[in-house]
Amino acid sequence: MSLLSIKQTAMIGVAILMTMAHCTRTPEWQAKNEELITKYDLTKRELSGVPEPSIESDLGPGAVTNLESLPQVQLHPDVRARISWGTGVMLSILDLAPNAEIPEEVLPADRFVFVLEGSIRHLVNGSPVTMISREREEPDGVHGATPRTDFVYLEEGTKSAVVAGDSGAKLLELYSPQRLDYLQKAGVQELPNSVPRLKNTADANVVPGKVYDLYEMQRTELSSGAYGIILSAKQMQLGFVSIEPGAIVPPHIHPEEQLEIVLRGDGRAIILDEKQDVKPNDLVRIPSNMVHGAEAGGVGYDALSIFWPPRPDHQEMAKAATQAFRAIIPEGAQVELVADGKKTKPELHFTEGPKWVNGKLYFSNMYFDKDFNADPKRSSTVELDPSTGRYRNIIEGQMQANGMYPYKNGNLLVCDMMGHRIVEMTTTGKVVRVVVNSYDGKPIDGPNDIVVDAKGGFYFTDPQFTMEPEKFQSGRGVYYVSNDGKVTRLLEPNAFAMPNGIVLSPDGKTLYINNCYDDESWYPVNSDKDNHIWAYDVNPDGTISNGRKFATLLLTENVLKRKGRSSGADGMTIDKAGNLYVATFYGVQIFNPKGEFVGIINLPSFPVNLCFGDDDMKTLYIVSLSKVYRIRTNMEGFVQYL
């Protein structure tokens, strides 16, 4: 269950948990709370239009319950649930046996439902839709499927029925207000005849009845190191937030009640100034204006915060983040499959280095097995006609090319990675000449990615990702080749654990370099570059200086779990406004010219490289393993055509 989750500061109330038996007695915790509000100079606010609670929560204020400790309640044959509730919301974790059914019902409250495992056939007002969950594949030379968590928001009064798939399903339901029939089945006594609704409802930012994939929803940078997906409904608001390792959420308060579930990772909850380690499936209720904070551990953590009523400040933050993303990726733009190299011929394996030249897309087709063993004889360079999706090899069996860049005379500079050289090639596949194959009297190892400057020189990365156990150069490197052919190593060997993507700003004054792998037990080099994009000033002679962190790339949950810093950052491209697009395990991560996170383009498998194309240069072409995708943008891409 790797959803996403938590905020920092008074922005997304990241309340996380703590077992405090002495805090469950209202007078005691409130007295201490008032002292802490004064101590931290916090401003207490009260809400209007919030009904008096008619049902007492099963969770004490500030006290932790692990979801696994809750008793299971049978809702229907082969459908069992663990149920908990706050003042205005209810959550239930449903386990459905294979093909189990939840009969059609008229929903008595607004509801979100997320598919955590398996699949369901969901009837919404009689219309069927399939909803699924999929785990992330560990990326290698063959595999790379990205995760999927389908969800839907339905309003009170909607007709709903569910049938589990052949392997069953696990669902997360969130209701506001609480369901009286669920409470009856949970054995709660003396229930009221009805549950009051909020007088002042919020505007939903999701369409009722529309199925979404959680990983398609845009993340908001809530504070340094905290990114969240904010889903607002009329009666409640959800915040799926991820906090990076070591981040600290300072003490804060908010007038909305909050239920929070830890989904992944480790950390310490800080409630009423006391700390406690927390683990996945821990659940806590934070009453209105209770002082709380958190500290992320070595693997960071994800959590789901459920707010009642919805927080307007969160909604405004999410709105602003969406507007920034939509300024680049227009509303309605969808990732489109252009070519599937497992269904058409010639077969595509591990696609790389796409570049747009004279109305065609050119890219490398690298053969790898799952362990990244290469074979130049099974590799090729490909020309694709985007108007038809048809493609052909322009050269095959002669080199295992990687990055490419448009060069003089309408030709391409091509990184022949396994051939230890960079060549100039025509768009018909003819090698014109070897441009560089050595540095300091020794062969270069494996040129990976490349970018040309306005003077005809070029930069390339060499992460030594080659088959020879003994390398020629003394470490991973970044190089500059001037227009007259002089080769300069720009950084000390192994300054980057795995230098990969490289791109210049449109004005040519800044060079950006990313780092693919770092801090892994199985990788031979560690560096201090971690999961960052680094920016360097470009000097008049092509050398670089003033290296600095430009942006931080989000890490996937499997990398965080092993305490790695491998973003999978590969190819990068840039638009004329200076926005940077980075292919990573997480998707295409977009940053503005200041290095601020803008959003993510999600794909069915992790993107490897990308470029702008089409007549207006506003279409982003993205290669991913055996497939080629595209998506329209509002921005014009920058390429240094000579």
Please describe what each predicted stretch is.
Residues 145-150, 156-182, 288-313:
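Ligand-binding loop in jelly-roll beta-barrel domains
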Residues 102-104, 122-123, 131, 145, ...:
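Short beta-strand His + acidic residue motifs that chelate non-heme Fe in jelly-roll/DSBH
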Residues 65, 209-212, 316-642:
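Sequence-structural signature of mature extracellular/luminal beta-sheet repeat domains
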Residues 75-77, 90-107, 222-224, 239-253:
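Conserved short histidine dyad/triad with adjacent acidic residue
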Residues 26-90, 130, 134, 138-143, ...:
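A short, N-terminal "cap"/entry segment at the start of jelly-roll beta-barrel domains
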Residues 108-127, 256-267, 272:
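Glycine- and acidic-residue-biased ligand/ion/polar-headgroup-sensing regions
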